[in-house]
Amino acid sequence: MKIKTRFAPSPTGYLHVGGARTALYSWLFARNHGGEFVLRIEDTDLERSTPEAIEAIMDGMNWLSLEWDEGPYFQTKRFDRYNAVIDEMLEAGTAYKCYCSKERLEALREEQMAKGEKPRYDGRCRHGHEHHSDDEPCVVRFANPQDGSVIFDDQIRGSIEFSNQELDDLIIRRTDGSPTYNFCVVVDDWDMEITHVIRGEDHINNTPRQINILKALNAPVPVYAHVSMINGDDGKKLSKRHGAVSVMQYRDDGYLPEALLNYLVRLGWSSGDQEIFTREEMIKLFSLNAVSKSASAFNTDKLLWLNHHYINSLAPEYVATHLQWHIEQENIDTRNGPQLAELVKLLGERCKTLKEMAQSCRYFYEDFAEFDADAAKKHLRPVARQPLEVVRDKLAAITEWSAENVHHAIQATADELEVGMGKVGMPLRVAVTGAGQSPALDVTVHAIGKSRSIERINKALAFIAERENQQ
């Protein structure tokens, strides 16, 4: 049997972390078994579904490289198929037309609640004793079995049982002729030959209803696995303040897709004590029986730690392809300066996100208008004039421009003036970067370039001279 899974989001908003984890688990399960992964857009909610949300979902899936083998399928393009199946069910007697008014149903609901009963349809139209004209408005209900129970073996939670007496005669077609969500899902899973349905635990109550419809259609019932919810690190329902933002927001904030995937796979799944997983390792090791049925806690600090790891462990050339987008957002012209892969090597240890890296690299490519006030006040003082003049001349004398030779020039300046390296290094750092912090000074000066470094030292010397004149 070929394994076939699906990810079926509703395009009423962005692809959030919970949906992305569900998609990842479904994708990994299919890949682990050499199966297929289907993308289906469940857009039957016409009022809330938007083209922008569809685009956001596709962008998120593509950024995470969760490629699909079939689709995307759209439920709104399959209404003829759904209605054809409903008509067959009406003919077979497994569905019936219901003419009950909203007023009657509301009165029935209030009466049942007053008695402490669970609100449910009472089956008045099920046996068709009343005569109605063909043009009279009606819904179509599924004739749910009235006795027995539905039992399914959830691959994460074990055996789950629902009494059929607890289940309503579900509406499967509205008065306007549109099919309902629970019915569309059933026909889709049947037609698309889905073997395993991996989804959030909020769908557990839908499962017995869907199984009963599948059985009424003599269709195969897929295997179900319901993933637990994700909480914030305070144990409360995940919200934006915990990090429940769109997948693409993580891209915008400077995270690598590898970091987010690694983090999401560990939100409920484990393989021993291993924390870092390549995509290939995830595919090889993933199994549903290792998914926890307990809620997971979202921890942004852990995600940030993973991102820093991947910035420094992946090939700099690859990281640079993702950094490029952030560089463009900052409007930095990188034609005159180090290659982005070199920049990743320079700033990787200091920066935990690519956004931070892009925001802290401008001095490598563009001259700055002024020095950081605090750094200049502390380090660009008259006492720094001689160290800057000497190191400038030694840098100018370098014939083979390299980080090693830059280091020798700085060291030689300190030795000649009989001062510590900091007395040379700190003024030089502020002079060439405009600020008091940077990567190692020798590689920084080397990356900025010989002529630009000397120009900036001269600018710093002019700043010191002007400062002296003002005193």
From Swiss-Prot:
This is Glutamate--tRNA ligase. GO terms for molecular function: ATP binding; glutamate-tRNA ligase activity; tRNA binding; zinc ion binding. Zn(2+) binds at C98, C100, C125, H127. Signal peptide: none annotated. ATP binds at K240. A motif ('HIGH' region) lies at residues 9-19. Binds 1 zinc ion per subunit. PANTHER family: GLUTAMATE--TRNA LIGASE, GLUTAMATE--TRNA LIGASE, MITOCHONDRIAL-RELATED. GO terms for cellular component: cytosol.
